[in-house]
Design a protein with these regions (language model features):
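Short, acidic, small-residue-rich periplasmic hinge/interaction motif at the N-terminus
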Residues: 26-64, 105, 113
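Extracytoplasmic beta-strand/coil segments of soluble accessory domains associated
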Residues: 72-119
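C-terminal beta-signal and adjacent terminal beta-strands/loops
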Residues: 118-123, 553, 558, 648-659, ...
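Short acidic/polar hinge/loop motifs at secondary-structure boundaries
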Residues: 117-152
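Outer membrane beta-barrel strand-and-loop segments of large Gram-negative receptors
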Residues: 353, 363-372, 419-423, 429, ...
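Gram-negative outer-membrane beta-barrel transporters
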Residues: 184, 437-441, 547-552, 563-659, ...
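N-terminal periplasmic accessory domains that precede
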Residues: 71-74, 96-99, 111, 135-138, ...
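Periplasmic-side early beta-strands and strand-to-turn transitions of outer-membrane beta-barrels
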Residues: 176-299, 554
Length: 729
């Protein structure tokens, strides 16, 4: 074995960086040009991916259980992950997004190839903390994913603003040195003709444009999922709750990769996506029957909102005599065009016009990172990084919707034309972390991050993670970190004004109507996230159990503290920092090689001990008490594989305590009982270049119909049949 420190003084093949980016171990052996080998010590970022709160979904996993449309459908099968709304209110109940460890979708940071994707932030933030959005996990088609990293707990804190719950990093397929291409077709057909069917087609092409020096990757995708029938829930239970809306996706994305030298690569990326909905009748408060002139009913099946997203990026990765570097510059623009909505009381979020308005969100990002292998007393890799982000929002329809001409509200004009439709924020950050091999089998990863927000000041986020081998097969792993989330651009905008004539006022306001204004004097939300776990690995057997706890404070909520009275006598409230909340639970996983290389059994489970706001006693979001995902994976022959998968969801409890005046004395105790979903699937490699797959989801046709009553906030689709074919070269 050659000396590592001496090797670092040589020009290294850039494959070292690629190996580190996909490492499954703490260290890797790399063969140098002269035939000798060296040990490359992993960075803190890669070592953190071995912590108990991290799961990896591979391209092969996606082939075995393909999502119908959105990647969230397979991400939800990881430990600690569920689909839910951002609050326990139940509004927008079928627009479920990724929730990690009960912290809510707004605390889940979505990345594509390591870069934040924040198009959902262009959608108006409601009084109860929900957005009419599908989230940001549907910008990449499943067939173009190389892997998905699901990062929970302390390991996620290094990513900064918005990662208090966790991080989803969607890694796309890279350019290749040889020409490769594929055309994929997929369809999903529900047995219930009131549920929406899906059709998808996409292609990808990658290869060299100038030998190994210049390579490219291009993909395109088109997908359509129909909306559920307008009366899918009404027919079952008489409710006006809407079913799942449909979506049309169109995506194109390209990457040029220039190998400047064997040690330096420059990537240039451009992407364009369009997502349009197929309206199913949702009105935020499920009261579409109150729509004036039957407008809501007349819009069923039409496109009422569409998002246009563009992203540009340039990234440089380098290997130097002293270590590795990465520098990137990125721009993301989202135009959110939708029919205008109400902003007052019970019609908040209800479409009230046939006129479209556009909200524009622009994000500018720059970041850089260096990794320095050191041998100061012990082997270690020091990481130093810096980030800068600017976000700019212009949403005239939401900021200027509420009209109270001639009224002054806590210094803010009630006249829409006098209120700004714009808001912006700048966040700068510095961070350092060190992957220290203190002893053989002992890794310690201290970290420190400082974020500075131009409106809300600075925030320190320290972290400490540990991995300790306990013999050859068992490891103890633990971590603690302080995570952080800045106020969003609606909460912090003085011009964002909502109102209610009384019923929507908090229940401590005994009488009168209310205004809710933005607040530029908020504190960032923080959470101290902790976990400790044991891991066993031997001869294909894997088992682990992890305890986690998040102590969450300063959660930003619609205010209950009366600031005074407006000139028209309305009570004035503003967005404010709430008290404390706590989330804790257990996660476990088990993999058993029943028949080596032929039949394996994989299981993971999550049990929520508690999830509640200490001020109100209500849960942060509605999620199952426990979730168990298990799969038998059978490699029948070299060409044929099949799987049987089963998911058990525990009971889901609603909010117990009224938060608004109209809820007092009328809270529903309706629970969703435990239920399970079974599916079967198969893949067959017909030829070297032709693969087919198919299966049945929800084999026993367990359906849930949304009632908008208590915890009954969403539809669980019934039995469906799917099939796909991929032709490649």
């Amino acid at each position: 074995m050659i000396d590592k420190k001496k090797c670092l003084m040589k020009p290294l093949a850039f494959t070292i960086a690629a190996i580190l980016s996909t490492s499954a171990l703490a260290d890797d052996e790399v063969e140098l040009d002269d035939g000798e080998t060296m040990t490359v010590h992993a960075t803190a970022k890669e070592e953190l991916k071995q912590q108990p709160g991290v799961s990896i979904i591979t391209a092969e996993d996606i082939e075995k259980t393909p999502p119908v449309n959105d990647l969230s459908e397979i991400i939800r099968k990881m430990p600690g992950v569920n689909l839910t709304g951002n609050s326990a209110s139940g509004s927008r109940g079928n627009n479920r997004q990724i929730d990690i460890r009960g912290m809510g979708p707004e605390n889940t940071l979505i990345l594509v190839d390591g870069v934040p994707v924040t198009s959902r932030n262009s959608v108006r933030y409601s009084w109860r903390g929900e957005r009419d959005t599908r989230g940001d996990t549907n910008w990449v088609p499943p067939e173009l994913v190389e892997r998905i990293e699901v990062i929970r707990g302390p390991a996620a804190a290094r990513y900064g603003n918005g990662a208090a719950g966790g991080v989803i990093n969607i890694i796309t397929k890279r350019p290749t040195n040889d020409w490769h291409g594929a055309l994929s077709l997929f369809t999903n057909q529900p047995e219930n003709d009131k549920e929406g069917a899906t059709k998808r087609a996409n292609f990808n092409l990658s290869g060299p444009l100038a030998g190994d020096a210049l390579t490219m990757r291009l993909y395109g995708n088109i997908n359509k999922t129909d909306a559920d029938d307008y009366d899918i829930n009404t027919q079952q239970n008489g409710s006006y709750a809407a079913g799942r809306e449909g979506v049309r996706n169109k995506d194109i994305n390209g990457v040029l990769s220039w190998k400047i030298t064997p040690e330096q690569i420059l990537d240039v990326e451009y992407g364009y996506s369009r997502q349009g909905n197929i309206y199913a009748g949702d009105t935020q408060y499920s009261n579409g029957n109150l729509s004036p002139n039957g407008l809501v009913e007349s819009l069923y099946g039409q496109e009422t909102n569409r998002l246009y997203r563009q992203n540009y990026g340039i990234t440089h990765n380098g290997i130097w005599e002293w270590g590795q570097s990465r520098v990137g510059f990125y721009y993301e623009k989202t135009n959110n065009t939708r029919l205008q909505e109400g902003s007052t009381g019970r019609v908040e979020g209800m479409i009230n016009s046939d006129q479209y308005a556009t909200s524009r969100l622009e994000n500018y990002r720059a970041n850089g990172e260096i990794n320095l292998p050191l041998n100061l007393w012990v082997e270690q890799t020091l990481t130093l990084g810096a980030e800068w982000e600017r976000e700019e929002l212009n949403d005239p329809a939401s900021m200027q919707s509420t009209s109270a001409e001639g009224v002054v509200i806590n210094g803010v004009s009630g006249d829409p034309s006098a209120r700004s439709s714009k808001n912006s924020a700048d966040i700068s950050a510095l961070y350092l972390e060190d992957n220290i091999e203190a002893l053989p089998g002992t890794f310690i990863i201290p970290g420190l991050r400082f974020d500075y927000h131009n409106k809300f000041g600075g925030n320190w986020s320290p972290s400490l993670n540990l991995s300790q081998a306990l013999g050859d097969y068992v490891k103890l792993k633990a971590g603690i970190a302080r995570a952080y989330k800045a106020p969003n651009l609606y909460q912090s905008s003085e011009g964002y004004l909502l109102s209610t004539r009384g019923n929507g006022c908090p229940n401590n306001i005994a009488s009168g109507s209310c205004y809710l204004t933005g607040n530029d004097d908020l504190k960032p939300e923080t959470s101290v996230n902790k976990e400790i776990g044991l891991e066993f690995t031997k001869d294909g057997f894997d088992a682990g159990i992890t305890y986690f706890r998040n102590d969450y404070k300063n959660k930003i909520v619609a205010g209950t503290e009366l600031l005074g009275l407006a000139s028209n006598g309305y009570n004035i409230l503003q967005w404010e920092n709430g008290g404390k909340a706590v989330v804790e639970g257990l996660e476990g996983n088990l993999t058993v090689p029943v028949v080596k290389d032929t039949l394996s059994w994989r299981t993971n489970a999550t049990y929520m001990i508690q999830s509640k706001n200490k001020d109100t006693g209500n849960p942060l979001s509605i999620i199952p008490e426990y979730t168990i995902n298990t799969m038998l994976d059978w490699q029948a022959t070299e060409k044929l594989s099949a799987n049987l998968n089963w998911t058990l969801y525990g009971r889901q409890k609603p909010r117990e305590y009224a938060e608004s005046r109209n809820e007092t004395g009328s809270m529903s105790s309706r629970e969703v009982g435990a239920y399970s979903i079974v599916g079967v699937g198969m893949n067959y490699q017909l030829t070297k270049n032709l693969r087919v797959n198919g299966g049945v989801s929800n084999l026993f046709d367990k359906q849930l119909y949304r009632e908008n009553d208590g915890a009954s906030t969403y539809n669980e689709p019934g039995r469906a049949y799917y099939a796909g074919v991929t032709m490649s070269f």
